[in-house]
Amino acid sequence: MRIALGIEYDGTHYYGWQRQREVKSVQEALEKALSKIANHPVEVQCAGRTDAGVHGTGQVVHFDTTAERQMVAWTMGANANLPKDIAVRWAMAVPDEFHARFSATARRYRYVIYNHVYRPGILNSGVSHYHGELDVEKMQQAGQYLLGENDFTSFRAVHCQSRSPWRNVMHLNVTRHGRYVVIDIKANAFVHHMVRNITGSLIAVGRGEQKPEWIQWLLAQKDRTLAAATAKAEGLYLVSVDYPAHFGLPEMPIGPLFLPDNLN
């Protein structure tokens, strides 16, 4: 039997999603909890492997099990055995052809910046902080140059293992909500550090160091060394993953925190 789960987590105290030796990972904690419910070792496959410090409100995983349990056992039981910073939001049986990664048609991320002269005290690990003024209109204008199918070498980590730098960005919106600036980006997939590298360069535009057209120029150069520094992990969230409708996966509020689904 194959089961899909929706997962939410605070990535602050983890070395990323992927299981690794001798360090804490979200995957390892989830697999341990599910294995207790299943009474056999469980290995999960995820929609997107997030880096150290990155959060998730819309991560999707699947696993195979021989255990016969009601869906509530996978949600309530797993949550009872998980650390407080990881939670299962939903569970459902899926056909064997469903795959959390390969069946996905798009991933969506949100990067949240606390834009105020003083750093936050409560949400310091859930948002990034920038103290200077940010021109959100110019950031929004700059982001539109990244729409469509492009070679994202300029926004790709040097050690990225993806075979191709080409990705299709479906939307990229930058909006202000009081002291918070949110970068909302959706693509078929992302190369390593793509959202954080784009964010770093959009911040350079927002603070007046570069013009919006610089982003278009960067894209054409296909040179990571010309772009701005990678933005911090703290403000980044994997908020949703799209799948073909026939799988019937639940639709949940994407957040994070106080943010509505529609930011416009």
Swiss-Prot record:
Keyword Manganese listed: no
Assigned EC number: 5.4.99.12
GO biological process: tRNA pseudouridine synthesis
Disulfide partners: none
Enzyme category, top tier: isomerase
Molecular-function GO term, any one: pseudouridine synthase activity
Active-site residues from the entry: D51
Amino acids binding substrate: Y109
UniProt KW keywords: Isomerase, tRNA processing
Protein's UniProt keywords contain tRNA processing: yes
Catalysed reaction equations from the record: uridine(38/39/40) in tRNA = pseudouridine(38/39/40) in tRNA
Function text: Formation of pseudouridine at positions 38, 39 and 40 in the anticodon stem and loop of transfer RNAs.
Protein family according to the UniProt entry: Belongs to the tRNA pseudouridine synthase TruA family.
Quaternary structure (record): Homodimer.
Protein name stated in the entry: tRNA pseudouridine synthase A
Organism: Vibrio cholerae serotype O1 (strain ATCC 39315 / El Tor Inaba N16961)
